[in-house]
Structures are given as C-alpha cells and as structure tokens.
Amino acid sequence: MAFHARITIFAEGAHGSLTKTLVKKYNLRKKSDPQTYGIGLKEVWEVPKEQWREGEITHSMGYPLDKDTYGGGFMYHFGENLVSLGLVVGLDYRNPYLNPYQEFQVHTSSLTILY
C-alpha cells in the first residue's frame, strides 16, 4: 500500500506495530533521548482508624510486574482515614497480554498492611 500526502500522522499508540516499523525503518530514535511514558491507576480507600497513619508515604518498585516491565506502586495516607493506592506501569512493556488494570488488582490485594 502506498501513501501520498504532504503530511501523514500516525496515532496508533506507543505499542503499535506500524509505529515500531516506522521508527526502525527511518531510524527515528537516532540522536534522541526519548521520554518514557507510563499509565497510572489509583484508588482512594477509606480504612479503619487503627490502620490509618497520618502522612505516611510508601513507595514500591517492581511487584507485581515481571522483571522485564518497569513500574511501581504507592500508598499515601491522607485526610481522615483515607489512603490513596496506586500502580504505575511503563508503557514500553513487551508482553502483549499484560493488563495494567489486572496488575493493579494484584497490587492492591497484596497490601496486607491495610488488613
């Protein structure tokens, strides 16, 4: 298939097969320091007073992601008995079956510190 246009915009996403082909064919990463992007998922939970620790911040790296996927989690205690729980997953992951939302569910279900 041939495209003929003054400008062509490709907007298929960071993992698109066409994008990867174009980057490789035209060496689009040469002399660049490309940014990386991630998707963040967050929930706010109300917890019992005895499990809430005002101002406490916890960060984690890796788990539950595999060794080839970067990211990590966070837990912020704030407000009155509120905890913000989140997971960030780098969008350069290679596993096409990785589901950031499912990984977030694994992350939040493993937080025994809140139970």
PLM regions and their residue ranges:
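Predominantly flavin-linked oxidoreductase catalytic cores and closely associated redox partners
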Residues: 1-114
